Amino acid sequence: FVKNSGICETTPGVNQYSGYLSVGSNMNMWFWFFEARNNPQQAPLAAWFNGGPGCSSMIGLFQENGPCHFVNGDSTPSLNENSWNNYANMIYIDQPIGVGFSYGTDDVTSTVTAAPYVWNLLQAFYAQRPEYESRDFAIFTESYGGHYGPEFASYIEQQNAAIKAGSVTGQNVNIVALGVNNGWIDSTIQEKAYIDFSYNNSYQQIIDSSTRDSLLDAYNNQCLPALQQCSQSGSTSDCTNADSVCYQNIEGPISSSGDFDVYDIREPSNDPYPPKTYSTYLSDPTVVKAIGARTNYQECPNGPYNKFASTGDNPRSFLSTLSSVVQSGINVLVWAGDADWICNWLGNYEVANAVDFPGNAQFSALDLAPYTVNGVEKGQFKTVDNFSFLKVYGAGHEVPYYQPDTALQAFKQIIQKKPISST
């Protein structure tokens, strides 16, 4: 890999590394690592994963929370003052193989089969940079990360236990936090939330009451039974069926019922934001060479996505996995921008209220309170013990793009093992 390519992070004295680590035979997983801008010797380590399934984490790096971003259609990036490496050593990872700059053999067909390769990457990273082995570690992710985040965290905890018991050889990963924004976690809750959110949200009514009634009928008589069958049998055929039944009856009809961006309902479907400029930049041969990439950048290639679809991974619930991660005691944040449709805040809120942990009764009974950043109300939140929910005002799917200061504050609080709180 390449040290200090001069691309993206231009803060003097802040080191960066980009390149590949082997996670299996002919499996070259791309990572881009940035030291913390402040106190890198003590700062925690945080990994960022975009969703998809099969989308590159370079999206997050360049559009959301990385050291540089593209402003107003500029063709070259400028420094991002709200970068998450202000407070953490950040590693952005392209997974599974075939996504982004990662290349080689891809045998990942589901969230569960993706997890071991992510663990392999962390082990390979520690072998190269042993000074990070003892650091606090956090996973932050969005969208399909509602599947990835809970499963990756849970797998790491299982591996830690196996290492302690002597049945697995490897380095303990000191996981302390998980953050999932606008996540797809539980289809039973979130398919219904499409209907409720589309009828009643802060920005625009997408469906009228008679459409809502017919969609609720379709949910109860078509989508829900299919999801229950997937959940009960766990079979590929039942789960792929649930995926298509719910799409045909709920998501498809609503998303085609008006001209809106499913990632930001304030905008029309041809919304140019967040700008795609970064992907043009990452196809520049000079840039590719400088960072040590060996393949053409693919933002969200079809191949990996289709493998997940073929096993019916999407409608499989990760609510119980999320619950077990909260029960393990690590600091967990479920958060969402309030203008996103596809993984809307309402579905995320109802998932959060359903998380099974000792504080659930207290948590689900709590009303949301104002969340302020330097005295300005930027959203609403609630927190009990090690579990928090945050709704962010004026933000689409990629929250840090729309509300960078709010996102940075929430990130900082969670990685420092604190409940989120107003400032």
Swiss-Prot record:
Keywords: Carboxypeptidase, Disulfide bond, Glycoprotein, Hydrolase, Protease. The keyword Iron-sulfur does not apply. Pfam families: Peptidase_S10 (PF00450). InterPro entries: AB_hydrolase_fold, Peptidase_S10, Ser_caboxypep_his_AS, Ser_caboxypep_ser_AS. GO terms for biological process: antibiotic biosynthetic process; monocarboxylic acid biosynthetic process; proteolysis. It comes from the Eukaryota. Glycans are attached at residue 200. GO terms for molecular function: serine-type carboxypeptidase activity. It catalyses: Preferential release of a C-terminal arginine or lysine residue. The active site is at residues 143, 340, 397. One of its GO terms (cellular component) is fungal-type vacuole. Substrate binds at residues 343, 398. The keyword DNA-binding does not apply. It is an enzyme of class 3 (hydrolase). Its EC number is 3.4.16.6. Disulfide bonds join 8-68, 55-300, 223-246, 230-239. PANTHER family: S1, PUTATIVE-RELATED, SERINE PROTEASE FAMILY S10 SERINE CARBOXYPEPTIDASE. Belongs to the peptidase S10 family. This is Carboxypeptidase S1. It comes from Penicillium janthinellum.
